C-alpha cells in the first residue's frame, strides 16, 4: 500500500509545455504514472507528451477526472497555479517551484483555509522533489530507478537527502512505501505531521524515516506528536550539524534563528521523544536496517 498516490491516481501537469514540464512529464509517464493531461493557458486543444493540453485546470478536471496535479510554473505565477488547482477541486497539488515569495505562500495558505477541512487541497512543497510510491507512481523530479518498493515511509525536507536514503536502503534490500519531499522553504504547504498521520493509517508502512534540517519548529513538533500518537518506529536525522547561527544553508528555511533551531538541539529533542537518530547521512540505510531488525 502507499499514501497520497498510486498507479491509478489521475495526474495533471501544470506547465506541461515548458522545458521542465515536458522533461519531467515524460519521465513520470515512462515510470508508469497515470498522467491524463496538461495545462498551459493559451495552448488548449493541443496534444503534448501524448496527453491532451487544456487552458485551465477546471477544463482539464472536467475532461479527465484528474484528482492530482504537479506544477512546473515560474515563481511569480506559482501561487496562482496552486489556487487554481484548489478551485478546480483537486485533492493534491505538488509544487516543485523554487523561489516562490513567502508572502505568496502565506496567501495560498489563507486561501486554502476558505475550504472545509475535508475538501481542502493538500499542497506538497514548494521547492520540493515531490512524491513517489515506488513501482506505482511518481509525482516529482526524483530518479525513479533508485527506489525499491517496500514498507518504510520517508518524509524529507531535502530532496537529495531523500534520494540518498532511498539509494542506501535499496542496496540493503529495504524498500519504500511512499517517499514525500515536503520542501525546504520557510512556509510549506504541508508538514511532517500531515504525512506522519497518513503513514500511521497505512497498514503496510512499518517504519518511517524523517529527514529534517536546521531552522523552524517542524522537527520538534513532529517528535512530540510521534511520542503520543505514532505506533511505529521512527528514524530521525537533522542536516546542518556544523551550520553557524544566522547563515542560510541551502534552503530558504534552513537558517538557525532561535533556540531549538540547530541540528544538535533538534537531534536531542528527537531522542528525548524516543526516535532513533541517524548519526550522519551515510548511515541512513544501516540505521533503518537496525531499527527494523529490533522491531521484527
UniProtKB/Swiss-Prot annotation:
Under which EC number(s) is this enzyme classified?
6.2.1.9
In this protein, the active site sits at 251
GO terms (BP aspect) = tricarboxylic acid cycle
Q: Which cellular component appears as one GO term in the record?
A: succinate-CoA ligase complex (ADP-forming)
Q: One MF term in GO for this entry?
A: nucleotide binding
PROSITE patterns listed in its UniProt record: SUCCINYL_COA_LIG_1 (PS01216), SUCCINYL_COA_LIG_2 (PS00399)
What pathway or pathways are given for this protein in its record? One-carbon metabolism; formaldehyde assimilation via serine pathway
Residues that, per the record, bind CoA: 17-20, 43, 96-98
What are the entry keywords? Ligase, Nucleotide-binding, Tricarboxylic acid cycle
Catalytic activities: (S)-malate + ATP + CoA = (S)-malyl-CoA + ADP + phosphate
Q: What SMART domains would the database entry show? A: CoA_binding
| Enzyme's top EC category | ligase
Organism superkingdom: Bacteria
HAMAP family annotated for this entry? Succ_CoA_alpha (MF_01988)
* Subunit structure of this chain's protein: Heterotetramer of two alpha and two beta subunits.
Family (UniProt): Belongs to the succinate/malate CoA ligase alpha subunit family.
Name of this protein = Malate--CoA ligase subunit alpha
Organism, scientific name: Methylorubrum extorquens (strain ATCC 14718 / DSM 1338 / JCM 2805 / NCIMB 9133 / AM1)
Gene that specifies this protein: mtkB
